[in-house]
Swiss-Prot record:
Cytoplasmic side: 233-640
Gene that this sequence comes from: IGF1R
UniProt feature, compositional bias: Low complexity: 573-589
Short motif (IRS1- and SHC1-binding): ranges: 250-253
Family recorded in the similarity comment: Belongs to the protein kinase superfamily. Tyr protein kinase family. Insulin receptor subfamily.
UniProt name for this protein: Insulin-like growth factor 1 receptor
Key words of the record: ATP-binding, Cell membrane, Cleavage on pair of basic residues, Disulfide bond, Glycoprotein, Isopeptide bond, Kinase, Membrane, Nucleotide-binding, Phosphoprotein, Receptor, Repeat, Transferase, Transmembrane, Transmembrane helix, Tyrosine-protein kinase, Ubl conjugation
Fibronectin type-III domain sequence ranges: 5-101, 107-200
Main location: membrane
Chain ranges on the Extracellular side, renumbered to this chain: 14-208
Residues reported in the UniProt entry to bind ATP: 278-286, 306
Length: 640
């Protein structure tokens, strides 16, 4: 329990006097190493030098006039008389503590007291002048004629106030004695000091009562008002779904059946069979099962069955059915399909298309080489990444064409089918599963800040342009096998970083073609981002043959316009990946190789006119680029 403070550099000096004389003359500057000195700032500020003494022709000596119960370090050198300084051996040292001195811990002077208001007094006493090591605390024993009480006062508290205050004393006569406690033990008790605590007058008691009574009445009334308000809120919440009012024919008998009207999507409960749990959804458990007659020309179909928790409020049950009603409007191969609803009876069920490989986030993480459950699947190639991106963009293009803004596009909300097709998942299903991906800003609802665009973070505006930004983050998740975006930043730091124009870094081993597509989606100006149809147009040549047969992009419902032919000289043309449009006014994508084809880029067939560097916008960092960087050419969008 000792600490050694290294001595400063010094020159050896000869001290011809005997050790006793040296120590007595400088006794207060001796090296002292108390076990508790590290807790006292004043002790740490004092530096104790070493003192030297020569002992001739002896193997023992006595050092006197040392401080009591104090730890010393003693160094011994063996020296040759003729060699003087150069003939000394290396030092051998020992630590030794002196014996405690009797009476050193006694408080030397008288104890005094001062009256203080509110039935309290202040005791003062002097410190022991040369205690045994270090004073640790003081103990006060005080009391009236009935019984004694004890109060402990630390050394730090004593040095701060110069004494101690005794509070909450009853009126009457008291005696008090004080004892110091050092490293070696307890000192003697002081002589008793007598003091008197006066009783409050009747007038003072009346004043205190007049002040306390109105305050107590106000607190009681305020508490009752708060209790009634909370009780009223809870009663309305349990009856009407967290305070949201819904029109009903008979409010006294309000249920989900009064709000949701069965239609052609209604499925008889006896046609549904549950087999096993798939996981927890935002409203309740999701099961795998079999449904009869929900798909044309299929007697039985494997389906996913969503349920509502038994403890769910009426509001949650209605939101559950409303989500199913939204899904009724969608009929796209790259959007998870609704197959039916069971609204009659309990629990309410929603029948969805079964996506056997789960959500895209979990699927991507299962492809990591270090995963134990990796079924010997290699990480996705560039062509597979582009295939995933095209399928997600096709589903989002369909939603955009139907005037639907997703607002929560992320890998966790995309689902993977048995044949590895990626589809836009049923909306809101994964909110509880990946709770850490969301952030509650300013007491509002949970927000997926790491996937949100700058305008959504600033103004709460969600459009198809903000969905395109989120699509770029999904591409980043695909390239990193579902790493968390903006690793190392808290949600609050991500808010500031994105709103100030910050972007995700290029993932390791990410193909240039995929990263350039991400940068297109991360233009700071929303109108400068490509549409989902433009994104599909830029990657359509890389898609598998089956994409043309099932996609919304090639369907009659979309009917994309024929691209205009460009009458340009071949020497003025170059192949640039992911060109967002076929207009002659298009600008090329940012390319770190000065206009050369990006690595792993698409084949020939996508041609644009290259703009010179001087023609590019000088303030590109305001539209998604970074400061102190080569100006970022901005792709032209048909939405401008």
């Amino acid at each position: 329990n000792a600490i050694f403070v290294p001595r400063p550099e010094r020159k050896r000096r000869e001290v011809m006097q005997i050790a006793n004389t040296t120590m007595s003359s400088r006794s207060r500057n001796t090296t002292v190493l108390d076990t508790y000195n590290i807790t006292d700032p004043e002790e740490l500020e004092t530096e104790y030098p070493f003192f030297e003494s020569r002992v001739d022709n002896k193997e023992r000596t006595v050092i006197s006039n040392l401080r009591p119960f104090t730890l010393y370090r003693i160094d011994i050198h063996s020296c040759n008389h003729e060699a003087e300084k150069l003939g000394c051996s290396a030092s051998n040292f020992v630590f030794a503590r002196t014996m405690p001195a009797e009476g050193a811990d006694d408080i030397p002077g008288p104890v005094t007291w001062e009256p203080r208001p509110e039935n309290s007094i202040f005791l003062k006493w002097p410190e022991p002048e040369n205690p045994n090591g270090l004073i640790l605390m003081y103990e006060i024993k005080y009391g009236s004629q009935v019984e004694d009480q004890r109060e402990c006062v630390s050394r730090q508290e004593y040095r701060k106030y110069g004494g101690a205050k005794l509070n909450r004393l009853n009126p009457g006569n008291y005696t008090a004695r004080i004892q110091a406690t050092s490293l070696s033990g307890n000192g003697s008790w002081t002589d008793p000091v007598f003091f008197y605590v006066q009783a409050k007058t009747t007038y003072e008691n009346f004043i205190h009562l007049m002040i306390a009574l109105p305050i107590a009445v106000l607190l009681i009334v305020g508490g009752l008002v708060i209790m009634l308000y909370v009780f009223h809120r809870k009663r309305n919440s349990s009856r009407l779904g967290n305070g949201v009012l819904y029109a009903s024919v008979n409010p006294e008998y309000f249920s989900a059946a009064d709000v949701y009207v069965p239609d052609e999507w209604e499925v008889a409960r006896e046609k549904i069979t549950m087999s096993r749990e798939l996981g927890q959804g935002s409203f309740g458990m999701v099961y795998e099962g079999v449904a009869k007659g929900v798909v044309k020309d299929e007697p039985e179909t494997r389906v996913a069955i969503k349920t509502v928790n038994e403890a769910a409020s009426m509001r949650e049950r209605i939101e559950f059915l409303n989500e199913a009603s939204v899904m009724k409007e969608f009929n796209c191969h790259h959007v998870v399909r609704l197959l039916g609803v069971v609204s009659q009876g309990q629990p309410t069920l929603v029948i969805m298309e079964l996506m056997t490989r789960g959500d895209l986030k979990s699927y991507l993480r299962s492809l990591r080489p270090e995963m134990e459950n990796n079924p010997v699947l290699a990480p996705p190639s560039l062509s597979k990444m582009i295939q995933m991106a095209g399928e997600i963009a096709d589903g989002m293009a369909y939603l955009n064409a139907n005037k639907f803004v997703h607002r929560d596009l992320a890998a966790r909300n995309c689902m993977v089918a048995e044949d590895f097709t990626v589809k836009i998942g049923d909306f809101g299903m994964t909110r509880d599963i990946y709770e850490t991906d969301y952030y509650r800003k300013g007491g509002k609802g949970l927000l997926p800040v790491r996937w949100m665009s700058p305008e959504s973070l600033k103004d709460g505006v969600f459009t198809t342009h903000s969905d395109v930004w989120s699509f770029g983050v999904v591409l980043w998740e695909i390239a990193t096998l579902a790493e968390q975006p903006y690793q190392g930043l808290s949600n609050e730091q991500v808010l500031r970083f994105v709103m100030e124009g910050g972007l995700l870094d290029k993932p390791d081993n990410c193909p240039d073609m995929l990263f350039e597509l991400m940068r297109m989606c991360w233009q700071y100006n929303p109108k400068m981002r490509p549409s989902f149809l433009e994104i599909i147009s830029s990657v359509k040549d890389e898609m598998e043959a089956g994409f043309r047969e099932v996609s919304f992009y090639y369907s009659e419902e979309n009917k994309p316009p024929e691209p205009e032919e460009l009458d340009l000289e071949p020497e003025n043309m170059e192949s640039v990946p992911l060109d967002p449009s076929a207009s002659s006014a298009s600008l090329p994508l940012p390319d770190r190789h000065s206009g050369h084809k990006a690595e792993n880029g698409p084949g020939p067939g996508v041609l644009v006119l290259r703009a010179s560097f001087d023609e590019r916008q000088p303030y590109a960092h305001m539209n998604g680029g970074r400061k102190n960087e080569r100006a970022l050419p901005l792709p032209q969008s048909s939405t401008c």
